[in-house]
Amino acid sequence: MIYFGRSIDNHYTTMMTKTLEIDLRSAEGLKLNRRPIKKKTFAVVKIDEKCRKSNLDESRRSNPTWNYKSEMPINGNEQFIFIEVFYRTGSGHDKKIGEAKIPTNDFMGRYSPEGHLNFLSYRLRDEFGDKCGIVNLSILVKSDPTRDYGACSSQAAVTGLWRPRLETASIDGYGGRTVTGVPVWGLYQRQF
């Protein structure tokens, strides 16, 4: 397939897959028809065709807490993930309160490095586009330990001579403490 003069194949898109650790923390000010919700609520994360459902908050408040962690794969071509919040009726049916549309470049962009924990809050909107609350979550883009070692010998990786380092280095002379160095070469330079 040709797209803007470049060929895109399946191998390219599978290399862009990352793993997200999503923590659905809570919601604030949930409203239905401009009235605070006093029902059991839960949230759903949707990425492409995949979805994960949080536990049900039994408190029956308009500020529910879920603290639900989940890991989900995301293709590098995805532009948005969706968070939907539902309430459960007395008869056991689930009704949608609202949804938040989260751009992936908010946590996978060039200013947000891999391995950085992002705490995010987004406005929930109902089916008419009206504000119906805020959802709070955290997203961590898991880093691939083998990604940075692409420049090392591919032969070493194939033969099993290379393994990613799992422990942190310890320095015997400093008792494991962090040492900070400040360059001072500019202070003592001679003027010629």
Curated annotation (Swiss-Prot):
Entry GO CC: membrane
Coiled-coil stretches noted in the UniProt entry, renumbered to this chain: none
Subcellular localization: Membrane
InterPro entries per the UniProt record, alphabetical: C2_dom, C2_domain_sf, C2_SRC2/BAP
Membrane topology field: Peripheral membrane protein
Effect of loss of the gene: Dwarf, twisted leaves and enhanced disease resistance to bacterial and oomycete pathogens in cv. Columbia when grown under constant loght at 22 degrees Celsius. No visible phenotype when grown at 28 degrees Celsius. Accelerated hypersensitive response (HR). Bap1 and bap2 double mutant is seedling lethal.
Biological function: Negative regulator of cell death and defense responses. Exhibits calcium-dependent phospholipid binding properties.
Name the UniProt record assigns to this protein: BON1-associated protein 1
